[in-house]
């Protein structure tokens, strides 16, 4: 890449605009700054901001095929080499307010040894973590180190979210052991979160593996080794996701079984009640026809006698059901 001057990186509505000092810190990109491999410039943009969108479409620092990629629709994680630059798309857990974590945020990055251009729409907390390290003087020192720190933060947040989902599954299993059925939709939401995370984290692991194996000029051997370790860590998280998805399938079957048992018990109870009161209903209907000749209609104790007869009949039917082991 030709010389990258700070004057070409002045974007008024940029989220962040910094130059790494090569010692773990950052300085603002001044118009007189010159990006080097030892001190690359980092431009972090929200592609929905007007000046940022215009810069992405008009700057000569970006290849033509990269422009739409940095401001396009969300896609699955991938990495593409473009000459001396690399286009990377990654996904992360969404910790923004009023959003579910499984509604993943997207970060798109175009990198060379001298320039880092990253874009997003929704806030990515892993980037803020890296910026905090840079502002405290303990951050990455070059482009490759910057990328490793970003993917390390994304993977840490993903692992934490997977652990939270695992804890929810354990709680559901404990509740089912106590015959407690979860709230409607809770299991469906949990399975959706697991499946969505599995869908995007599997290709993201492949991206990390490729970055670790590619001989990118701006990544040294230590960066490649760390990238491979991060890929393996995410792979273990994917194994946990697979086992969690299988466990939720078992939980769904168990919940269906519990609900069916509860329905069967209610139906059985109603059937027994019908059997108990069917003879009494027949007799009360028979004696209620209001025709002449009904036994006891002239007896002052006729009603009491009839009620006692009904009680005896109910007790008799109940005894028979008990003796037949239906109760």
From Swiss-Prot:
Task: Extract the InterPro entries matched here.
Answer: CorA_cytoplasmic_dom, CorA_TM1_TM2, MgTranspt_CorA/ZnTranspt_ZntB, Zn_transp_ZntB
What is the designated name of this protein?
A: Zinc transport protein ZntB
Tell me where in or outside the cell this protein is found.
Cell inner membrane
Residue ranges, Periplasmic compartment?
Answer: 293-300
This enzyme catalyses: Zn(2+)(out) + H(+)(out) = Zn(2+)(in) + H(+)(in)
How is this protein annotated for GO cellular component? plasma membrane
The alphabetized UniProt keywords are: Cell inner membrane, Cell membrane, Ion transport, Membrane, Transmembrane, Transmembrane helix, Transport, Zinc
Membrane topology classification = Multi-pass membrane protein
Family classification? Belongs to the CorA metal ion transporter (MIT) (TC 1.A.35) family.
Summarizing the function annotation, the protein's role is: Zinc transporter. Acts as a Zn(2+):proton symporter, which likely mediates zinc ion uptake.
Coiled coil feature spans: none
The portions of this protein that span the membrane are 272-292, 301-321
Designated gene of the protein: zntB
> Which segments does the topology annotation call Cytoplasmic?
1-271, 322-327
- The record's principal subcellular location, in a coarse class, is membrane
Listed GO MF terms: cobalt ion binding; cobalt ion transmembrane transporter activity; magnesium ion binding; magnesium ion transmembrane transporter activity; zinc ion transmembrane transporter activity
């Amino acid at each position: 890449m030709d010389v990258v001057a700070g004057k070409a990186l002045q974007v008024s509505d940029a989220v962040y605009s910094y130059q790494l000092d090569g010692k773990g810190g950052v300085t603002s990109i001044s118009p007189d700054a010159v990006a080097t491999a030892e001190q690359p410039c980092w431009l972090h943009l929200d592609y929905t901001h007007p000046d940022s969108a215009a810069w992405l479409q008009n700057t000569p620092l970006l290849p033509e095929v990269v422009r739409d990629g940095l401001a396009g629709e969300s896609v699955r994680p991938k990495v593409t080499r473009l000459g001396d630059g690399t286009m990377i798309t990654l996904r992360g857990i969404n910790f923004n307010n009023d959003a579910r974590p499984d509604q993943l945020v997207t970060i798109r990055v175009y990198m060379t040894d001298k320039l880092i251009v990253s874009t997003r729409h929704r806030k990515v907390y892993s980037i803020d973590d890296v910026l905090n390290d840079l502002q405290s003087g303990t951050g990455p020192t070059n482009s490759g180190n910057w990328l490793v720190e970003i993917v390390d933060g994304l993977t840490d947040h993903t692992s934490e979210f997977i652990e939270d989902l695992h804890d929810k599954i354990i709680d559901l299993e404990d509740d089912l052991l106590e015959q407690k059925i979860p709230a409607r939709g809770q299991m469906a939401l949990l399975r959706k979160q697991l499946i969505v995370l599995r869908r995007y984290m599997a290709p993201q692991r492949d991206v990390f593996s490729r970055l670790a194996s590619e001989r990118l000029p701006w990544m040294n051997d230590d960066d490649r080794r760390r990238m491979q370790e991060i890929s393996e860590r995410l792979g273990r998280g994917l194994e946990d996701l697979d086992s969690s998805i299988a466990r939720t399938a078992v939980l769904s079957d168990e919940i269906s079984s519990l609900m069916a048992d509860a329905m069967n018990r209610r139906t059985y109870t109603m059937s027994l009640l019908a059997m108990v009161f069917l003879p009494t209903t027949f007799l009360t209907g028979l004696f209620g026809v209001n025709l002449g000749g009904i036994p006891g209609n002239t007896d002052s104790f006729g009603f009491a006698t009839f009620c006692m007869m009904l009680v005896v009949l109910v007790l008799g039917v109940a005894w028979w059901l008990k003796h037949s082991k239906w109760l």
